[in-house]
Protein backbone atom coordinates (compact mmCIF):
# COMPACT_ATOMS: atom_id res chain seq x y z
CA UNK A 1 0.00 0.00 0.00
CA UNK A 2 1.23 3.47 -0.89
CA UNK A 3 0.14 7.01 -0.12
CA UNK A 4 -1.20 8.64 -3.28
CA UNK A 5 -2.50 12.02 -2.11
CA UNK A 6 -2.04 14.53 0.69
CA UNK A 7 -4.49 17.43 0.74
CA UNK A 8 -5.60 20.24 3.03
CA UNK A 9 -8.95 22.03 2.94
CA UNK A 10 -9.76 25.19 4.87
CA UNK A 11 -13.18 25.06 6.52
CA UNK A 12 -14.95 28.00 8.15
CA UNK A 13 -17.93 27.95 10.50
CA UNK A 14 -20.38 30.55 9.12
CA UNK A 15 -21.81 31.15 12.59
CA UNK A 16 -18.64 31.88 14.53
CA UNK A 17 -15.98 32.44 11.91
CA UNK A 18 -13.87 29.68 13.45
CA UNK A 19 -11.67 27.78 11.04
CA UNK A 20 -10.01 24.40 10.89
CA UNK A 21 -7.85 22.76 8.25
CA UNK A 22 -9.12 19.33 7.26
CA UNK A 23 -6.19 17.15 6.20
CA UNK A 24 -6.69 13.99 4.17
CA UNK A 25 -4.14 11.29 3.35
CA UNK A 26 -5.28 8.65 0.85
CA UNK A 27 -3.81 5.41 -0.46
CA UNK A 28 -3.85 3.39 -3.67
CA UNK A 29 -6.19 0.88 -1.99
CA UNK A 30 -8.96 3.40 -1.35
CA UNK A 31 -8.35 4.14 2.32
CA UNK A 32 -8.31 7.72 3.60
CA UNK A 33 -7.28 9.07 6.97
CA UNK A 34 -8.41 12.48 8.21
CA UNK A 35 -6.89 15.00 10.58
CA UNK A 36 -7.33 18.58 11.72
CA UNK A 37 -4.91 21.44 12.23
CA UNK A 38 -5.72 24.69 14.03
CA UNK A 39 -3.59 27.77 13.39
CA UNK A 40 -3.43 30.33 10.56
CA UNK A 41 -5.38 28.28 8.04
CA UNK A 42 -3.86 29.49 4.79
CA UNK A 43 -0.36 29.06 6.14
CA UNK A 44 -1.16 25.55 7.40
CA UNK A 45 -2.64 24.53 4.03
CA UNK A 46 0.41 25.84 2.19
CA UNK A 47 2.79 23.88 4.42
CA UNK A 48 0.77 20.63 4.28
CA UNK A 49 0.72 20.72 0.48
CA UNK A 50 4.33 21.87 0.15
CA UNK A 51 6.74 20.09 -2.14
CA UNK A 52 10.52 19.84 -2.02
CA UNK A 53 12.33 23.18 -2.17
CA UNK A 54 15.68 22.21 -0.68
CA UNK A 55 17.90 19.46 -2.04
CA UNK A 56 19.86 19.24 1.18
CA UNK A 57 16.90 17.74 3.06
CA UNK A 58 16.26 20.69 5.36
CA UNK A 59 12.86 21.40 3.82
CA UNK A 60 11.82 18.48 1.66
CA UNK A 61 8.11 19.30 1.75
CA UNK A 62 5.42 17.30 3.55
CA UNK A 63 3.55 16.19 0.45
CA UNK A 64 6.76 15.19 -1.32
CA UNK A 65 7.91 13.14 1.65
CA UNK A 66 4.64 11.23 1.95
CA UNK A 67 3.72 10.49 -1.65
CA UNK A 68 4.63 6.88 -2.40
CA UNK A 69 5.37 6.06 1.24
CA UNK A 70 3.98 3.05 3.10
CA UNK A 71 1.51 4.35 5.73
CA UNK A 72 1.87 1.31 7.97
CA UNK A 73 4.89 2.39 10.05
CA UNK A 74 3.89 5.56 11.87
CA UNK A 75 7.06 5.94 13.89
CA UNK A 76 9.19 5.89 10.74
CA UNK A 77 6.92 8.39 8.98
CA UNK A 78 6.90 10.80 11.92
CA UNK A 79 10.68 10.64 12.27
CA UNK A 80 11.06 11.19 8.54
CA UNK A 81 8.73 14.17 8.54
CA UNK A 82 10.42 15.80 11.53
CA UNK A 83 13.93 15.22 10.21
CA UNK A 84 13.29 16.50 6.70
CA UNK A 85 11.08 19.54 7.33
CA UNK A 86 12.86 21.18 10.26
CA UNK A 87 13.66 24.39 8.37
CA UNK A 88 9.94 25.25 8.25
CA UNK A 89 8.22 22.85 10.65
CA UNK A 90 10.33 22.62 13.78
CA UNK A 91 7.77 24.72 15.67
CA UNK A 92 4.89 27.15 15.24
CA UNK A 93 2.58 27.05 12.23
CA UNK A 94 4.83 24.61 10.41
CA UNK A 95 4.56 22.12 13.25
CA UNK A 96 0.77 22.58 13.35
CA UNK A 97 0.72 21.50 9.70
CA UNK A 98 2.69 18.39 10.68
CA UNK A 99 0.19 17.80 13.49
CA UNK A 100 -2.74 17.72 11.08
CA UNK A 101 -0.94 15.26 8.81
CA UNK A 102 0.11 13.18 11.80
CA UNK A 103 -3.50 12.92 12.97
CA UNK A 104 -4.58 11.78 9.52
CA UNK A 105 -1.84 9.15 9.47
CA UNK A 106 -2.96 7.75 12.83
CA UNK A 107 -6.55 7.59 11.57
CA UNK A 108 -5.37 5.88 8.39
CA UNK A 109 -3.20 3.38 10.26
CA UNK A 110 -6.05 2.36 12.53
CA UNK A 111 -8.31 1.81 9.53
CA UNK A 112 -5.55 -0.14 7.77
CA UNK A 113 -5.13 -2.51 10.72
CA UNK A 114 -8.83 -2.58 11.63
CA UNK A 115 -8.25 -1.38 15.19
CA UNK A 116 -8.84 1.82 17.17
CA UNK A 117 -5.82 4.08 16.78
CA UNK A 118 -4.99 4.00 20.49
CA UNK A 119 -4.12 0.30 20.24
CA UNK A 120 -1.26 1.26 17.94
CA UNK A 121 0.04 3.70 20.56
CA UNK A 122 0.48 1.18 23.35
CA UNK A 123 -1.30 -0.59 26.16
CA UNK A 124 -4.10 1.07 28.06
CA UNK A 125 -2.71 2.80 31.16
CA UNK A 126 -5.43 5.32 31.93
CA UNK A 127 -8.35 3.70 33.77
CA UNK A 128 -10.64 6.75 33.41
CA UNK A 129 -11.23 9.07 30.46
CA UNK A 130 -12.82 12.06 32.15
CA UNK A 131 -13.84 15.15 30.15
CA UNK A 132 -14.02 18.65 31.51
CA UNK A 133 -16.40 21.08 29.85
CA UNK A 134 -15.18 24.57 29.01
CA UNK A 135 -17.72 27.37 29.47
CA UNK A 136 -17.11 30.31 27.17
CA UNK A 137 -19.93 32.08 25.37
CA UNK A 138 -18.28 35.10 23.83
CA UNK A 139 -17.76 38.71 24.77
CA UNK A 140 -19.99 40.72 27.08
CA UNK A 141 -20.19 42.52 30.38
CA UNK A 142 -19.29 40.70 33.56
CA UNK A 143 -22.95 40.43 34.56
CA UNK A 144 -23.78 38.88 31.19
CA UNK A 145 -20.89 36.45 31.55
CA UNK A 146 -21.92 35.53 35.08
CA UNK A 147 -25.49 34.81 34.00
CA UNK A 148 -24.40 32.76 30.98
CA UNK A 149 -21.89 30.83 33.04
CA UNK A 150 -24.34 29.93 35.78
CA UNK A 151 -26.92 28.80 33.21
CA UNK A 152 -24.25 26.65 31.56
CA UNK A 153 -23.21 25.19 34.91
CA UNK A 154 -26.76 23.93 35.37
CA UNK A 155 -26.55 22.22 31.97
CA UNK A 156 -23.19 20.69 32.85
CA UNK A 157 -24.59 19.24 36.06
CA UNK A 158 -27.72 18.04 34.28
CA UNK A 159 -25.66 16.26 31.62
CA UNK A 160 -23.66 14.43 34.26
CA UNK A 161 -20.21 15.87 33.63
CA UNK A 162 -17.65 15.56 36.41
CA UNK A 163 -15.43 18.62 35.82
CA UNK A 164 -15.80 22.12 34.42
CA UNK A 165 -13.67 25.10 33.39
CA UNK A 166 -14.68 28.75 33.45
CA UNK A 167 -13.08 31.55 31.46
CA UNK A 168 -11.86 34.96 32.58
CA UNK A 169 -10.85 36.79 29.42
CA UNK A 170 -10.58 40.52 28.78
CA UNK A 171 -13.65 40.31 26.52
CA UNK A 172 -15.96 38.51 28.94
CA UNK A 173 -14.59 39.58 32.36
CA UNK A 174 -13.22 43.07 31.60
CA UNK A 175 -12.10 43.68 35.19
CA UNK A 176 -9.86 40.78 36.29
CA UNK A 177 -10.84 41.32 39.95
CA UNK A 178 -14.36 40.13 39.06
CA UNK A 179 -12.82 36.71 38.46
CA UNK A 180 -13.04 36.05 42.18
CA UNK A 181 -16.81 36.51 42.21
CA UNK A 182 -17.20 34.34 39.10
CA UNK A 183 -15.26 31.48 40.64
CA UNK A 184 -16.98 31.90 44.00
CA UNK A 185 -20.43 31.64 42.48
CA UNK A 186 -19.55 28.56 40.45
CA UNK A 187 -17.83 26.86 43.39
CA UNK A 188 -20.83 27.49 45.63
CA UNK A 189 -23.07 25.79 43.08
CA UNK A 190 -20.97 22.73 42.25
CA UNK A 191 -19.43 22.09 45.67
CA UNK A 192 -15.83 21.63 46.77
CA UNK A 193 -15.45 18.06 45.49
CA UNK A 194 -16.25 18.96 41.87
CA UNK A 195 -13.05 19.67 39.86
CA UNK A 196 -13.07 23.32 38.77
CA UNK A 197 -10.54 24.84 36.39
CA UNK A 198 -10.05 28.53 35.59
CA UNK A 199 -8.57 29.84 32.34
CA UNK A 200 -7.08 33.35 32.45
CA UNK A 201 -6.23 33.37 28.75
CA UNK A 202 -2.71 34.75 29.27
CA UNK A 203 -4.22 38.07 30.29
CA UNK A 204 -1.42 38.96 32.70
CA UNK A 205 2.13 39.70 31.60
CA UNK A 206 3.83 39.74 34.98
CA UNK A 207 3.36 38.41 38.49
CA UNK A 208 2.65 41.78 40.09
CA UNK A 209 -0.46 42.25 37.95
CA UNK A 210 -1.80 38.86 39.03
CA UNK A 211 -0.93 38.83 42.72
CA UNK A 212 -4.09 40.25 44.30
CA UNK A 213 -6.48 38.10 42.28
CA UNK A 214 -4.51 34.88 42.65
CA UNK A 215 -4.23 35.34 46.41
CA UNK A 216 -8.03 35.35 46.60
CA UNK A 217 -8.33 32.31 44.33
CA UNK A 218 -6.47 29.98 46.69
CA UNK A 219 -9.57 29.60 48.86
CA UNK A 220 -11.53 27.90 46.07
CA UNK A 221 -9.41 24.74 45.72
CA UNK A 222 -9.10 25.01 41.95
CA UNK A 223 -8.03 21.90 40.08
CA UNK A 224 -5.87 24.15 37.90
CA UNK A 225 -5.29 27.81 37.10
CA UNK A 226 -4.64 27.86 33.37
CA UNK A 227 -2.54 30.32 31.39
CA UNK A 228 -2.05 33.20 33.84
CA UNK A 229 0.96 34.35 31.76
CA UNK A 230 2.39 33.61 28.31
CA UNK A 231 4.39 30.37 28.52
CA UNK A 232 7.76 32.09 28.16
CA UNK A 233 7.32 34.17 31.36
CA UNK A 234 9.16 31.60 33.44
CA UNK A 235 10.21 33.95 36.26
CA UNK A 236 6.61 35.06 36.70
CA UNK A 237 5.46 31.44 36.84
CA UNK A 238 8.08 30.77 39.52
CA UNK A 239 6.96 33.73 41.60
CA UNK A 240 3.32 32.72 41.26
CA UNK A 241 4.03 29.10 42.18
CA UNK A 242 5.86 30.26 45.30
CA UNK A 243 3.08 32.66 46.30
CA UNK A 244 0.05 30.45 45.66
CA UNK A 245 -1.19 26.98 46.54
CA UNK A 246 -3.28 26.74 43.35
CA UNK A 247 -1.94 24.25 40.77
CA UNK A 248 -0.78 25.93 37.55
CA UNK A 249 -1.28 24.81 33.95
CA UNK A 250 0.08 26.27 30.72
CA UNK A 251 1.25 25.50 27.22
CA UNK A 252 -1.64 25.61 24.75
CA UNK A 253 0.15 28.42 22.87
CA UNK A 254 3.04 26.05 22.21
CA UNK A 255 3.23 23.41 19.50
CA UNK A 256 6.09 20.89 19.33
CA UNK A 257 6.88 18.81 22.41
CA UNK A 258 10.40 20.28 22.47
CA UNK A 259 8.90 23.76 22.94
CA UNK A 260 7.70 22.74 26.39
CA UNK A 261 11.09 21.85 27.84
CA UNK A 262 11.71 25.23 29.56
CA UNK A 263 8.29 25.03 31.23
CA UNK A 264 8.92 21.45 32.34
CA UNK A 265 12.35 22.36 33.69
CA UNK A 266 10.97 25.38 35.56
CA UNK A 267 9.26 23.09 38.11
CA UNK A 268 6.36 25.51 38.40
CA UNK A 269 3.53 23.64 36.68
CA UNK A 270 1.23 20.89 37.85
CA UNK A 271 -0.02 20.38 34.27
CA UNK A 272 1.08 21.07 30.71
CA UNK A 273 -1.37 21.51 27.85
CA UNK A 274 -1.20 20.52 24.22
CA UNK A 275 -3.61 18.99 21.75
CA UNK A 276 -3.71 16.79 18.68
CA UNK A 277 -4.72 19.65 16.36
CA UNK A 278 -1.60 21.67 17.25
CA UNK A 279 0.93 19.37 18.89
CA UNK A 280 0.07 16.23 16.94
CA UNK A 281 -0.84 12.78 18.18
CA UNK A 282 2.76 11.55 18.03
CA UNK A 283 4.26 14.55 19.80
CA UNK A 284 1.47 14.45 22.39
CA UNK A 285 2.93 11.10 23.34
CA UNK A 286 6.41 12.58 23.60
CA UNK A 287 5.09 15.47 25.68
CA UNK A 288 3.09 13.22 28.01
CA UNK A 289 6.15 11.07 28.64
CA UNK A 290 8.42 14.07 29.21
CA UNK A 291 5.91 15.52 31.66
CA UNK A 292 5.57 12.21 33.49
CA UNK A 293 9.33 12.12 34.09
CA UNK A 294 8.94 15.42 35.96
CA UNK A 295 5.87 14.27 37.87
CA UNK A 296 3.69 16.63 35.84
CA UNK A 297 0.23 15.91 34.48
CA UNK A 298 -1.04 16.58 30.97
CA UNK A 299 -4.37 18.22 30.12
CA UNK A 300 -5.14 17.86 26.38
CA UNK A 301 -6.36 21.11 24.82
CA UNK A 302 -9.58 20.67 22.87
CA UNK A 303 -11.33 23.99 22.31
CA UNK A 304 -10.40 24.35 18.64
CA UNK A 305 -11.23 21.93 15.86
CA UNK A 306 -13.99 19.36 15.76
CA UNK A 307 -14.74 15.75 16.58
CA UNK A 308 -11.60 14.51 14.82
CA UNK A 309 -9.37 16.49 17.15
CA UNK A 310 -11.47 15.52 20.17
CA UNK A 311 -11.28 11.85 19.24
CA UNK A 312 -7.52 12.04 18.71
CA UNK A 313 -7.09 13.55 22.18
CA UNK A 314 -9.15 10.76 23.71
CA UNK A 315 -7.17 8.05 21.91
CA UNK A 316 -3.89 9.51 23.14
CA UNK A 317 -5.24 9.81 26.69
CA UNK A 318 -5.98 6.07 26.82
CA UNK A 319 -2.30 5.15 26.93
CA UNK A 320 -1.00 7.72 29.45
CA UNK A 321 -1.74 7.62 33.16
CA UNK A 322 -0.84 11.28 33.74
CA UNK A 323 -3.85 12.60 31.78
CA UNK A 324 -6.57 13.08 34.42
CA UNK A 325 -8.92 15.26 32.34
CA UNK A 326 -9.61 15.95 28.65
CA UNK A 327 -11.04 19.24 27.42
CA UNK A 328 -14.42 18.76 25.73
CA UNK A 329 -16.83 21.09 23.99
CA UNK A 330 -20.17 19.24 24.01
CA UNK A 331 -22.75 19.79 21.31
CA UNK A 332 -25.45 20.36 23.92
CA UNK A 333 -23.72 23.54 25.11
CA UNK A 334 -22.53 24.71 21.70
CA UNK A 335 -25.21 23.62 19.20
CA UNK A 336 -24.28 26.34 16.69
CA UNK A 337 -20.61 25.34 16.50
CA UNK A 338 -20.92 23.49 13.20
CA UNK A 339 -17.29 22.44 12.92
CA UNK A 340 -17.48 20.98 16.40
CA UNK A 341 -20.88 19.30 16.19
CA UNK A 342 -21.41 18.28 12.58
CA UNK A 343 -18.19 17.92 10.59
CA UNK A 344 -17.40 14.48 11.95
CA UNK A 345 -19.58 12.00 13.82
CA UNK A 346 -20.36 10.20 16.03
CA UNK A 347 -19.69 12.04 19.26
CA UNK A 348 -17.64 10.15 21.84
CA UNK A 349 -19.83 8.00 24.02
CA UNK A 350 -20.30 9.18 27.61
CA UNK A 351 -21.40 7.07 30.55
CA UNK A 352 -21.55 8.40 34.11
CA UNK A 353 -19.60 11.48 33.05
CA UNK A 354 -16.72 9.56 31.46
CA UNK A 355 -15.80 8.64 27.90
CA UNK A 356 -16.12 4.99 27.03
CA UNK A 357 -13.06 3.32 25.55
CA UNK A 358 -13.02 3.87 21.76
CA UNK A 359 -13.54 0.64 19.83
CA UNK A 360 -14.08 1.66 16.18
CA UNK A 361 -11.23 1.48 13.67
CA UNK A 362 -9.02 4.53 13.28
CA UNK A 363 -10.12 7.59 15.21
CA UNK A 364 -13.66 6.24 15.05
CA UNK A 365 -15.39 9.17 13.35
CA UNK A 366 -16.69 9.73 9.83
CA UNK A 367 -16.21 13.06 8.06
CA UNK A 368 -19.25 14.59 6.38
CA UNK A 369 -17.63 15.43 3.05
CA UNK A 370 -20.77 17.13 1.76
CA UNK A 371 -20.72 19.52 4.71
CA UNK A 372 -16.97 19.97 4.32
CA UNK A 373 -17.47 21.00 0.72
CA UNK A 374 -20.11 23.51 1.80
CA UNK A 375 -17.86 25.01 4.48
CA UNK A 376 -14.66 25.12 2.45
CA UNK A 377 -13.07 28.44 1.55
CA UNK A 378 -10.33 29.11 -0.96
Identify the meaning behind each predicted range:
Residues 26, 43, 215, 221, ...:
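Shared catalytic-loop signature of beta/alpha-barrel
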Residues 37, 133-135, 166-168, 198-202, ...:
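A cross-domain feature marking catalytic cores of carbohydrate-active enzymes
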Amino acid sequence: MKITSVDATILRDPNSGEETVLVSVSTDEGLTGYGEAVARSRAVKAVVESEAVDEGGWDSGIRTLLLGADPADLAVLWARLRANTFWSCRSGVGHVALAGVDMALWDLAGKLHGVPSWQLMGARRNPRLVPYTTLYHGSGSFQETLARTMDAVEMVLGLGFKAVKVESMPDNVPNPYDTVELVSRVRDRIGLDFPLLLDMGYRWHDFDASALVVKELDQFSLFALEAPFPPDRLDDYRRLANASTTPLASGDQLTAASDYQPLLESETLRFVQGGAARTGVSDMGNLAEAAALKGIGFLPWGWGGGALATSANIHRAVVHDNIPLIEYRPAELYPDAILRTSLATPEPVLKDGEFLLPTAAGLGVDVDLTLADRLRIE
